[in-house]
Amino acid sequence: MLITVYCVRRDLTEVTFSLQVNPDFELSNFRVLCELESGVPAEEAQIVYMEQLLTDDHCSLGSYGLKDGDMVVLLQKDNVGLRTPGRTPNHPRADFTGSGSAVPGTSSSRHPHQHQHHYHHHQRIPSTQQAHGLASGENMTFAQELDSPALIRSMLLSNPHDLSLLKERNPALAEALLSGNLETFSQVLMEQQRERTLREQEMFRLYSTNPFDQETQARIEEEIRQQNIEENMNIAMEEAPESFGQVAMLYINCKVNGHPLKAFVDSGAQMTIMSQACAERCNIMRLVDRRWGGVAKGVGTQRIMGRVHLAQIQIEGDFLQCSFSILEEQPMDILLGLDMLRRHQCSIDLKKNVLVIGTTGSQTHFLPEGELPLCAKLLSGTVQEESSDREVGGTIKHPVKGPGRKKH
């Protein structure tokens, strides 16, 4: 089996190498092989695997659970002074995730065998696990756990995964890291550690004075709630990272009165609507029955100018009858609501990414993001536009009839 060894020497230099060994290979012989590759004397070498120190030289590597493709950490005794990895009674494990739990993708996650390349080192040698932890800054451990900002900085810069986590969860520290100034990075890091220490001291004071005090109980409850939220988010980021992305809305190509349009398919909308500007381009404003005007209320309010009782909409080769409620201000041209979808027995097939017209049997593909109208594209500065879309969606679900509006 192939074992990768991450070695930290006495002078803090690092080297990584791989060794081809058998599962029944004894630990003492493995140390000798590591000495040939790293120059670290076998008697000074400490081997760490899955946060556990391997001590019995007469045990085989297989008995420790090592398998093909695994990684171990080799630390030199004298300068490193390795302590047993994991939590100790007085000092919590280095964890900067804001939840008290391991960052997704580390060896203490729910599936440790899938994340075998993250380990704890000595307090002077922050491990990859600790570097992962820098990704939030919410839950900083004691400053003495990490007294080498230069080493932390170099480890983060050399690991793209850790750097991406840092950008997501601790933008301030990431900005200091990418500035290229070690002094700035050290200041931000130490400041966050100090803030964490002060928070821990405050919580300890509350616990020690009167743990049954109403204010203390409220603080404890809030602390537990925040930890549960962070843990839930961390699990979601590990198990379902796609849930943090945005999805493109469902649009199709269509034509009204010969004019090509991009229609938003919304099965949650009560009725099919069209913007005033689009109705003017399609030359159907002359058919608007203003007796059906009113105010639509939902997330916001919009004025309904009236209704076009009958028009034709072309989807692929099919010409379908449709009615439109005309809204005065709307970001999208046309929205196909439940009235039109039910009328033509349409079904949304997300597996095939098509809209199926039940009455004709034809289907049309939903548009990719690159072909969406500007108001629907997933751009960083479009929060307001997306909010407008949601407003329209809510607006058409709760129409309020005007004085002259008739009942459907």
From Swiss-Prot:
Residues 82-135, 386-408 are annotated as: Disordered. One of its GO terms (molecular function) is aspartic-type endopeptidase activity. Gene3D superfamilies: Acid Proteases (2.40.70.10), Phosphatidylinositol 3-kinase Catalytic Subunit, Chain A, domain 1 (3.10.20.90). It comes from the Eukaryota. Residues 1-81 form the Ubiquitin-like domain. The keyword Hydrolase applies. Pfam families: Asp_protease, Ddi2_HDD, ubiquitin. Its EC number is 3.4.23.-. SUPFAM superfamilies: Acid proteases, Ubiquitin-like. Keywords: Aspartyl protease, Hydrolase, Protease. Residues 110-124, 398-408 have a biased composition (Basic residues). InterPro entries: DDI1_N, Peptidase_aspartic_DDI1-type, Peptidase_aspartic_dom_sf, Ubiquitin-like_dom, Ubiquitin-like_domsf. It is an enzyme of class 3 (hydrolase). Belongs to the DDI1 family. This is Protein DDI1 homolog 1. It comes from Mus musculus.
